[in-house]
Amino acid sequence: MTDFSPREIVSELDRFIVGQADAKRAVAIALRNRWRRLQLEGSLREEVLPKNILMIGPTGVGKTEIARRLAKLAGAPFLKVEATKFTEVGYVGRDVEQIIRDLVEVAIAQVREKKRKDVQARAQVAAEERVLDALVGPGSGPATRDSFRKKLRAGELNDKEIEIETQAGSGSPMFEIPGMPGAQIGAVSLGDIFGKMGGRTKKRRLTVADSHEILVNEEADKLLDTDQLVQEAIAAVENNGIVFLDEIDKICVRDGRSGGEVSREGVQRDLLPLIEGTTVSTKHGAVKTEHILFIASGAFHIAKPSDLLPELQGRLPIRVELNALSRDDMRRILTEPEASLIKQYVALMKTEGVTLDFSDDAIDALADVAVAVNSTVENIGARRLQTVMERVLDEISFVAPDRHGETFQVDADYVKTNVGDLAKNTDLSRFIL
């Protein structure tokens, strides 16, 4: 779990996301509160529940991007899911408890990766012995093995092909158990039922270099205590887990609609106990959800937050509104983030030996076109910039391999030549931009 202060979290998010200070502050405080709770003792720690967040804002303003960046910062089990993928329990499709099962799998992978590093040195030695067995045979003498070991460490044998036995992947047949709700639970792997079948292995031919990582990971896993690893992962989910529920506005039931709504109101009802706190059964054990932080987000351009079930609204107490992007925001998005669009295109063209040079007026023109099309066609926020950039650089991208060593100057006139008329013609821009 990260111990960044809210100010540090916000400044980290600022490196990649323009504006939306309120949303950044809300998630930064929520993340810091996770750390604060863990510093408390005994019963008080159990009483402090996370303050779940509802982010409201038009499409393309940074809601999902905030979640992506937060996942990397959190250092905690983090899962992003779309609310539209779930159906009410008892119907075909995934039920919401699958969210927690997936979160446990994420946590197990995280803990395993961390623990592998602790046994890395011993695993390297064991993996080296397995490579030597494949090269010179298990019964070879010490002198031969030492000679090959020196060559192996010097990298002289990297391209040599060897045959090794590796653990068979999770390719066990899957089948449905009738009557079990939700396709994801119903599909059970034979490997899960009968264990690992005595550790099935398969032979593979690989180069020495390619086999290294596979063998090191296998040897590291042999040194790990799986039961302890799973317990740690479940504890991490229960205390630090974060779930980002995207597109929550799409499961609102709007006035005048009637019918079963198994993937709308039914899903909202199923989410209630999950967010409030319940115990979910997974194949690794029971998981309590009281202290998992839920961050929900939606555009709410047709439905309103008040269209959510009142009980669900109450379980998302912190509301954050994200603003639509202005022309100035568009301009900043093109230039300021560490991996801004312009930096990406310059780097891509550099691989062809072509230099792209954007003038300031070109950046203004790109922002103007994006804002103009957003206002006349459909406002899709910053995503419009990608469409405009692709259109502007279409010709350069196509001819770049034949123009090695050349410099292309992109200015306002170049932008207008390529997209200016399209932006003005609303009927055309509906289909092209």
Curated annotation (Swiss-Prot):
- Keywords recorded for this protein, A-Z: ATP-binding, Chaperone, Cytoplasm, Nucleotide-binding, Stress response
Which terms does the record give in the GO molecular function aspect? Answer: ATP binding; ATP hydrolysis activity; peptidase activity; proteasome-activating activity
> Which residues are recorded as binding ATP?
18, 60-65, 246, 311, 383
Q: Where is the protein localized? A: Cytoplasm
Family, as annotated:
Belongs to the ClpX chaperone family. HslU subfamily.
Describe its assembly.
A double ring-shaped homohexamer of HslV is capped on each side by a ring-shaped HslU homohexamer. The assembly of the HslU/HslV complex is dependent on binding of ATP.
NCBIfam families the UniProt entry points to: hslU (TIGR00390), PRK05201.1 (NF003544)
Biological function: ATPase subunit of a proteasome-like degradation complex; this subunit has chaperone activity. The binding of ATP and its subsequent hydrolysis by HslU are essential for unfolding of protein substrates subsequently hydrolyzed by HslV. HslU recognizes the N-terminal part of its protein substrates and unfolds these before they are guided to HslV for hydrolysis.
Protein name (record): ATP-dependent protease ATPase subunit HslU
Q: Which organism is it from?
A: Rhodopseudomonas palustris (strain TIE-1)
Task: Identify the taxonomic lineage of the organism of origin.
Answer: Bacteria, Pseudomonadati, Pseudomonadota, Alphaproteobacteria, Hyphomicrobiales
As recorded in Swiss-Prot or TrEMBL, the protein's gene is named: hslU
